[in-house]
Amino acid sequence: MDTFSALADPTRRNILEMLSKKGQLSATDIYDKFSASHPAISQHLKVLREANLVQVEKKAQQRIYQVNPEAMHKLEVWAKKMAQVLDVRFEALDKVLEVEKRKIKKHG
């Protein structure tokens, strides 16, 4: 699954937010934070792993999850690029609106 499809689900975004704040959490700790069934949360964790958004380390009988910092950095870079593109477009729209306002005032 691609990154954006993985991020489309609010439960998966919540898991990522928790991991970002806590650093590392066991699968059990993650399960305990949600009212959904363990299999449902396991599926969400699988999607996050497949999208390379989280890393998992097996310690004894536990699976410890953490955010993949490289993937988060790539998302941040992409989001900043998109913000710049939108800023340019909004600035152009502001200019058009200013011209239209002046026309209305002049001929109003």
Predicted regions and their residues:
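Short, Lys/Arg-rich nucleic-acid/phosphate-binding segment
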Residues: 58-64
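Short, locally clustered residues in the helix-turn-helix/winged-helix DNA-binding domain
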Residues: 5-8, 17-21
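Short basic coil micro-motifs at the edges of alpha-helical modules that engage polyanionic partners
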Residues: 4-5, 64
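Short, hydrophobic-biased segments on the C-terminal half of alpha helices
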Residues: 45-46
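C-terminal regulatory/oligomerization modules of transcriptional regulators
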Residues: 18-21, 25-26, 32-33, 38, ...
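Short alpha-helical elements of helix-turn-helix
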Residues: 1, 9-13
